[in-house]
Amino acid sequence: MKKATPELLEGYLKIMEAANKSNDGNRCMIAPSPELKKRLKDDLKKIKKQFGASVFSNILKPMGKTKVGLNDALLRPGNSFPLGMSASRVKSIAADRLPLQGTVRVIVVLVDFSDKQFSNTKKQYQDLFFSEGMLPTGSVKEYYKEVTNGLVDIAGEIVGPYRMPRTLAAYAHGESGTGDAAPNARTMAQDAAKAANSAVDFSLYDNDHDGYVDAFVVIHAGKGGEETGQGSDIWSHKWVLPGVYNADGTHVYAYLTVPEDCKLGVCAHELGHLLFGFPDLYDTDYTSEGIGDWCLMAGGSWNNGGLTPAHPCGWCKAQQNWVNTVTVSANKKGVAIPDVKDSKTIYRLWKDGGSGNEYFLAENRTKKNFDKFLPGEGLLIYHIDDAIDSNSNEMHYKVAVVQADGKKQLEGGANRGDAGDVWPGASKKLTFSNTTKPNSKSYGNIKTDVGIKKIKSTAGIITADLFVKAGPALAIVKSKLRKVKK
């Protein structure tokens, strides 16, 4: 067993410092691979035993109030917004622009370095991003076609590889490319834009005609820091250039970068930031698991080793109108809830059907298509608080999975999801209400009267009684409403 040496401590803290850059500025980084996460946990145990937990006091705690760009999809420089606009409003505008639908064009630039050359062909990336029926586990195009219910068609081109003016070691800068000091990964992305300018008409990639390229992707030679944990390898992320790069009557600013052996899940996750404004829904300070393997924007980007990423969660889909969100305004009996991939429907529940930042969402997820490698299948219930920026505080997530077994293993970091999270699931839980464990009370411990009862799964279809008021459910029989005892 590896000894907890000072060198191990230094290496661990460097990885955590690089990873925590997603809590600062405009960086949104991919979650570490399961293998790296396990290694970090093992190292953490050894270091705590040898040096004591106090060495982590400034590293592993939530970062508190952060700058604009934390886990959001800031796509334009701050000075492009009206003077005096609040940071939270800027974040909201960046993430809540009109959904991109129809053909969405993506430019992919390949780059290598004098100390690390490209070993793959351009066709491999053409297939990974834009092919149909070519890859056994699917392409970016096929992934977004499925999860958006056909509303988004990813298209574009691959150019390069271009030799960068600096080495990989220089851009990584010992900090996985995410350090503040130049050169870093954003310097690399700017150099990539300059190198590709003569071959690319960047105006074709401003899909919503707001004056900014929507998806500028840089694929670099070498491995990703999210898998190796090495400061000499660039950690996949979404960030912004050091300054706006003007080309072809438009602006290049936001970008994402992934390594040459990039997995579909990494690409789809980072495009979730860049194109659709999704925040990271894993815990970016790594003290918990966020919503784990249930969502592309959390650990689900790594399902099947990153080859078969999970669908975005129902909350993400609702932000982009990829699903029909049914607001439950009256108690209903015997509601049939098919797999969201078939029904394209999720359910919103709160006291009396009220609006506001806090509420519950429910969707049915089964193990098929890109959801094939989910940790379980059944009814997923989420506790949402849109007033919260991220999933960094395990006591109060922005988007939380209400785990049916009540063990809160996602918050505790015990796993990235299991069959006990869903309803009825492995724990065979049939009722969710004010009085069950887990319960439907608000974060302020106030009864909401939300209930999902008599939960049953038959051939992949969930049926349940839905409650948002104290009192009986209503059933529709021969076009007449009759009261039904709870």
Question: Which residues fall in each region the model found?
Answer:
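Zn2+-dependent metallopeptidase catalytic core
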Residues: 2-271, 348-354, 441-443, 449, ...
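Viral virion structural and adsorption modules
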Residues: 479-486
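Extracellular low-complexity, Gly/Ser/Thr-rich intrinsically disordered linkers
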Residues: 341-477
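Short, surface-exposed, polar/charged, turn-prone segments marking secondary-structure boundaries
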Residues: 135-139, 324-325, 387-391
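Extracellular hydrolytic enzyme modules, especially secreted metalloproteases
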Residues: 205, 215-374, 386-387
